[in-house]
Design a protein with these regions (language model features):
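Surface-exposed cleft-lining segments at the edges of enzyme active sites
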Residues: 7-9, 88-92, 113-120
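N-terminal, active-site-proximal structural segment of metallo-dependent hydrolase catalytic domains
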Residues: 1-56, 68-70
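His/acidic metal-ligating clusters that form di-metal
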Residues: 105-112, 124-147, 154-157
Length: 191
C-alpha cells in the first residue's frame, strides 16, 4: 500500500492521524509506504507521526528524513507487519526540496518507498539512482510511492524499462477529493 498522508492533514484541512490509521487498519496491509511525513515538527504539533501511526496500527515503523522542516524532520516512512532485517535510505534529487528512497530488507524480498520530485529532470535522475542502487539485489523488490509522474511522461516510460507496474494503471490518485491524475504507483522488479 502507498499512502501520501500530507503531514496528517485531511481533505477537511484538519490534522488527524487516527483517521489515517483507520484507513490502514481497514485495509490491513502487510506494508505501507508513507509519503509527506513529519517527525516532531512544530507545524504538526511536535508529534512523531510515523511512530504514532505505528502505535495506532500495530506495525513496525522506519523513517527516512529528506530535510529539516518546521524545527523537525520531514520525509517518508514505512510501516510493516514484520521487522526488517535491515534498512537503508539514500537521498534523491529534488529541485524544489530534497527527496529520499527508503528500502527495507527482508530475507526473501526488499520493500522500498519513495516520493519523487515535481521536476521531470530530478525524477529521471532519481530513476537512474534507484536502478544503480538496486541492481545488485538478488531477490524480489517492490517499490511504492508518490512518483509525481503521469503514465504518458518520459519518466514513467523510463521507469517501466527496468520495473514492472503492479498497481492499476487507470487508477487516478490526485487530488484526493476529485482524483484526475495518476501519480502514485507500485512497481516490482522485472525478474
Amino acid at each position: 500500500m502507498s499512502y501520501n498522508i500530507r503531514i496528517g492533514i485531511g481533505m477537511d484541512q484538519q490534522t488527524n492521524l487516527k483517521r489515517i490509521a483507520e484507513v490502514i487498519n481497514k485495509i490491513q496491509p502487510d506494508y505501507v509506504g508513507l509519503q509527506e511525513v513529519d517527525s516532531v515538527c512544530e507545524r504538526s504539533g511536535w508529534i512523531n507521526q510515523y511512530a504514532e501511526l505505528a502505535r495506532l496500527t500495530g506495525m513496525y515503523p522506519i523513517f527516512a528524513p529528506a530535510t529539516e522542516r518546521s524545527k523537525g524532520l520531514y520525509g517518508i516512512a514505512a510501516l510493516s507487519r514484520k521487522k526488517p532485517r535491515s534498512y537503508q535510505y539514500i537521498p534523491l534529487p529534488g529541485k524544489e526540496e530534497p527527496r529520499t528512497f527508503l528500502c527495507l530488507e527482508y530475507p526473501n524480498y526488499t520493500l522500498c518507498n519513495t516520493h519523487f520530485s515535481l521536476d521531470p529532470d530530478s525524477r529521471l535522475a532519481s530513476i537512474r539512482l534507484i536502478n544503480e542502487t538496486m541492481k545488485s539485489e538478488n531477490k524480489p523488490i517492490l517499490i511504492t510511492g508518490d512518483f509525481n509522474m503521469e503514465p504518458d511522461s518520459k519518466e514513467f516510460k523510463a521507469m517501466k524499462q527496468t520495473w514492472r507496474l503492479l498497481s492499476d494503471p487507470t487508477l487516478e490518485t490526485y487530488p484526493s477529493d476529485h482524483p484526475r491524475l495518476r501519480l502514485d504507483y507500485i512497481f516490482g522488479d522485472l525478474a
